[in-house]
Amino acid sequence: MKTIAAGSLSSAFIGCGDASMEKNKKISLGTKRNPIGVSTYSYWQFNGRETPIEYCIEKSAEYGFDGIELLLIQMESEENSYLQNIKKQAFHAGLDIMGLSTHQSFVSPDKSKRQENIDLTKHQIEVAYALGIPTIRINTGRWGTTMPTNGKSEFDVLMDNKGVEPVIDGYTENDGFKWVIDSIAQCIPTAEKCGVVLGLENHWGLGLTSQGVMRIVNEINSPWLKVTLDTGNFFDNREAQLEELAPHTCLIQAKTYFGGAKWPAFNEINIDYPKIGELMRKNNYRGYISLEFEGNENAETAVPKSLDLLRESFYFKLT
């Protein structure tokens, strides 16, 4: 069984394309590969939001992906004419626009701020609807108590702390969960009306653990709220946490770190994709895998290698 350490990815899959071609030949009748998409921010590499969505669509089609997941903050506009041109370009390129990755934060004692984020999320659902996208990634939000330190940004410090941050003084985690649950519940009617599944990601804040994610999903108990499963965002108890989320997953965001991870904490993580693939087969997952490349290697070489790796690992039985 392969185990993939982020820090060694730069060399672990030399010749991966050839190996994956051989494995493709061995896939038996009665099985099918999961469709593989790619997040547009895999091309951005945290160097700014200037990488155009149009370029990402062109490269994704060139590399042979089945779909593309759009990062909303990377889009230059939310005007309908821009959205429809993006949809048309993806269609002609042979790509599904299979996901929209959004940002919001419901973790605030300020009711007006929570309402602002509820309204924002409803708007994001409508953007997805205009693009024909079936699911959006949503977050709980964070406490916002992490501060820049020693020349490091707030997010760099958060990553050094593996996503853990203190609760706002005078409040409890239970307060935070109530805010998040009440806020997401108000977005469900819009999601149902537009036919867009909300995928709550294990992504810092109250979604740092599988238990936190499932507390929210179970409490709301709606078919329009599922899980966006990120393979790289669990630092501890990885297997148990992945297993807890797997049955509720509507989209997998699959991290790779060729060339080593930008944030050192992720170099400590071993992502065993064949094992994750087996877990998802046990749960009859037939949906999209969306590549999120977060390594230091140039995207032009790392993204195609990542596609080979994911093609090799994710498939399912037809019967």
Task: Go through each PLM region and give its residues.
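Conserved beta-strand positions in the central sheet of alpha/beta enzyme cores
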Residues: 69, 99-101, 137, 199, ...
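Short strand->helix junction
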Residues: 75-76, 107, 234, 296
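Glycine-rich, proline-tolerant flexible connector loops at the mouths of alpha/beta enzymes
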Residues: 69-91, 143-148
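Histidine-acidic metal/acid-base catalytic patches
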Residues: 1-40, 44-63, 132, 147, ...
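Active-site acidic/histidine proton-transfer and metal-coordination neighborhood
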Residues: 5, 10-12, 25-30, 89-92, ...
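Metal-dependent catalytic neighborhoods of phosphoester/phosphodiester hydrolases
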Residues: 78-86, 111-116, 299-302
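Residues that line or immediately flank small-molecule/substrate-binding pockets and catalytic motifs
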Residues: 72, 104, 140, 256, ...
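A short gly/proline-enriched turn/hairpin at secondary-structure junctions
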Residues: 72-75, 201-203, 294
